[in-house]
Amino acid sequence: VLIFCELGFELYRDQLNGYEFMFAFMPYMHTESLLYQRKGETQFFNQKNLYGTNPGKTKSLRNPNDTPFMTSIELTNYDKEYEMLKSMEPHLKGHLEVIQGFGRFPKRNVALGRESTSSEIKYMESPEVQKRPY
């Protein structure tokens, strides 16, 4: 999945709107590979930076193969996309921190038949952690 994800970003990155980006980005955020977590972090902030600090500005999505049926479009207001990306940032950071700390998502241990370490158990018992999926 991650190979297809990378290929897709390489080929279609400039054509993705914020919602499409978030869908395509999910494999990066949910992998237990620190390398791909970091790649995802880079992809995320590159996408967020497209919006800058003024989410109401116009953004062009260029289609390299403009035809009468598939043309480039101008998005004149994408405040909701920007807000959605902003709301995902804490989740991105949380997923990355878990992988940096444990090298895996401890909450997956039972489903994957893995034994939890004492530090993972302590982490999972934290009231704050129990409220989130990672």
Language model regions located:
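Intrinsically disordered, low-complexity activation-like regions
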Residues: L2-Y134
